[in-house]
Amino acid sequence: MSPGTFALTWYGHACFGLHAGAHSLLIDPYRPGGFGGAMALPPIGDPFDAVVVTHEHDDHAALDALVHPAPRVEAGPTGPFTLTRTRVYHDEYRGRRRGGTTDILSIAFANRRLVHLGDVGHSPRPDDLKALNAGPRIDLLIVPVGGYFTIGAAQAWEWCRALSPRAVVPTHAADPRVGLKLRPISHFLATSPWPVEEVEMSVECDEALLSFKSRVIVMGTSAH
């Protein structure tokens, strides 16, 4: 893998694996069979150097369900990755309806920057944008789009326009393997001003993918 190239794997729901060179980081692991069987997703069998979570809900922070346990990291440097957090709310009522706060994760490495919006439930606020736009341009933005528990399509596009990433990966949307009340990714794609590229569960993010006009990358197309 050449410098500046990284691989992203989607495991389901809001869980992603990041590989940069020989180093790896898992984001927001779910619990297989969680929520009374609603999370009908397979165990995460790949090993990782470390795990980071956006918030403590069981569909995002089930470290004890990993096949290969890995240490949890919070912020600062871990291997080649530097993690920073921006605290936001799970809904538009300061977290009173959907369970408090969630963090936005910014992960910088090898002249790249990935941002995972967690379960953000409101439009971007000036302080959010000030914090997130303080660093280099975002290469890849992972944004929830399914609504109900998080923002939906319209507010997701507010975040995308405000942060202007090179590429967007929509997540936390309807999935036949997840029995939660979520809207399909198609609602988000219907108003996309950017070209859409469909891939399967993994994608190699290189200069060719990230250098041109902003685009939407839909991962795991067979699952939607």
Where do the protein language model's features map onto the residues?
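Binuclear metal-ion centers of metallo-dependent hydrolases, dominated by the metallo-beta-lactamase
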Residues: 9, 99, 163, 167-224
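Zn-dependent metallo-beta-lactamase
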Residues: 1-21, 78-86, 210-211, 217-224
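Residues that mark the start of a beta-strand
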Residues: 7, 23-24, 111-113
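Pre-active-site segment of Zn-dependent metallo-hydrolases
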Residues: 15-52, 60-72, 87-100, 120-134
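Conserved acidic residues
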Residues: 49, 139, 166
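Active-site metal-binding loops of divalent metal-dependent hydrolases
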Residues: 29-31, 56, 88-89, 118-122, ...
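Active-site-proximal loop/helix segments of hydrolase catalytic cores
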Residues: 93-163, 176, 180
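Metallo-beta-lactamase
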Residues: 3, 62-103, 107-111, 193-213
